[in-house]
Amino acid sequence: MLSRRLKQLRLARGLSQDALVAEMGGIVTKQSISKYERGSALPSAVVMAQLARVLGVKSAALWGESVCRVEFVAYRKSSGLGSRDQVRVENLVRQALEERVQLQERVYGLHDELDFPVRRFAVDTLEDAERAAEDMRALWNLGSDPIGNLVGVLEDRQVHVIEIDAPEKFDGISAFALDDEGRHLGAAVVSRRGVPGDRQRLNLAHELGHTVLKIADALDEEKAAFRFGGALLAPRREFTDEVGARRSYVDLGELQLLKRKFGLSMQALLRRMRDLDIINEGYYQQWCIDINRMGWRRDEPAALPPEEPQWLQRTLLRGIAEGALTAEEGKTMLGMEIEDGERLEAIQRRAFLKLPMEERRRLLAAQGEAIAEHYAKDTAWRDAQGGEIHEYDD
């Protein structure tokens, strides 16, 4: 329905009705926009074209019916996100999840109920949240080793990982897509784009907790979700084997090594040690004071690169290849140009060029090290090139 879609797209782009009128060059009034959104009037073809241009969609997208409704699970109670930003975030996520559910139906023919443990694990205590993380690992056959790529694990299990541009106060949110009968068609965990990988991973694991835990009213929901997230990424037995059952001192260098192993920030690692009673409260608080003093709460040293969602790009490319959607539709959803028949390597190359320079340098350096290691181990290439290089004196 035009009225609902118009309002959703406007709010997702953070535009007031006055701002939308200004972006359209004043060809309509604020009152007209209000009537369109209430459904009491319809725009002309000229106005529709301008609305679509400003909102960055095709005119047909404004008339499209939603295949689902989106239900939000929880905001961080301490996020401090303003009401206007909250509305914008909700509409961004609503649009993104609706598009993904529609895409999975068009490309994969998926319209059955989601195979996902929606609020399956009852949690009355924080220890219950710990056990729920162990049960979740068992359900997904994750073993006990650290999870190398959490985003990949989530996407492989039909959880949409959505990244959005949002204020720094926003850390994450989770949501479900449901049909008219209340069946779950999709689940999403949402994180702010641009955060370091260690924070991103805990944010996503925390949001996953909101979707799979049934938390008692008497228990702090955020603490339970964070306990679940920490336990999912650093299982009790594996973590204790690595760190020890009791510690009176933890070195900064060790924390940085553990950060790389478990993919968690130093602050989250220290919290995990405290949760498992590896360190006492006094020592934990002293570390918190030191971290604040050094300005590391938001910007820790040795930051890990963020993990990149792949499902959307992969599904769009498959859909275009199989004729389920056009390159133009793919461009709109992915935010980059896609040519018909374009090779995957070219698309990946342009996606690479959109990364920050520091991240590109890191990836190229890692690739160079891998190639050097390969050639050091495999000497067959020397035979193909005529053997060793010898230097001769004149």
Question: Which residues does each PLM region occupy?
Answer:
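Short linear interaction segments
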Residues: R360-D394
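Active-site hotspot residues in diverse enzymes, especially metal/ion-binding acidic/histidine motifs
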Residues: M1-L344
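Enrichment for repetitive, rod-forming helical segments
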Residues: A12-Q17, L42, L355, Q367-G368, ...
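Generic hydrophobic, helix-prone segments enriched in Leu/Val/Ile
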Residues: R100-Q104, F352, Y375
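N-terminal functional modules and adjacent low-complexity/disordered segments of proteins
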Residues: L208, S265, I347-R350, E358, ...
